[in-house]
């Protein structure tokens, strides 16, 4: 879980899907839910819950100068550039993602759904596992 930077309950991170990360997600699947967010949800997450990592301290992303100072060498100068890099999984995705602090989300409004069972995967009416595009509804409830 620490390799995925998921150290607390209801934390969220972006991950580039590769063979190694898929294997890591398989190992922690009973404890996490994942899917493919839309650009609007990525933008909403960064604007509402986004914090940057500057000198190992958690800084809110209130000004583009914070991003330009940390990621200017990679061509990322504003919040929109950061969102674009995360959404497109560009060449500087790793640096942009490591700059972002893991998102601290709230517990979902109205719970995880009626009749959702903790010990079953999402495909079988549970909570954890791959939600694919339905992750967007959960993100909207947790922002």
Spans of model-derived segments:
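Core subunits and conserved enzymes of cellular information-processing
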Residues: 2-143
């Amino acid at each position: 879980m620490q390799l995925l930077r998921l150290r607390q309950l209801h934390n969220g991170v972006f991950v580039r899907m590769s063979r190694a990360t898929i294997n890591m997600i398989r190992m922690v699947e009973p404890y996490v839910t994942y899917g493919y967010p839309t650009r609007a949800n990525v933008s909403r997450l960064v604007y509402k819950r986004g914090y940057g990592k500057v000198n190992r301290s958690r800084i809110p992303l209130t000004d583009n100068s914070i991003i330009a100072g940390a990621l200017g060498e990679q061509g990322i100068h504003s919040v929109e550039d950061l969102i674009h890099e995360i959404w497109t999984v560009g060449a500087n995705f790793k640096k942009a993602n490591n700059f972002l602090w893991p998102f601290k989300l709230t517990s979902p409004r109205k719970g995880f759904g009626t009749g959702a069972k903790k010990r079953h995967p999402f495909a079988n009416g549970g909570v954890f596992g791959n939600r694919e595009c339905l992750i967007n509804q959960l993100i909207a409830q947790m922002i």
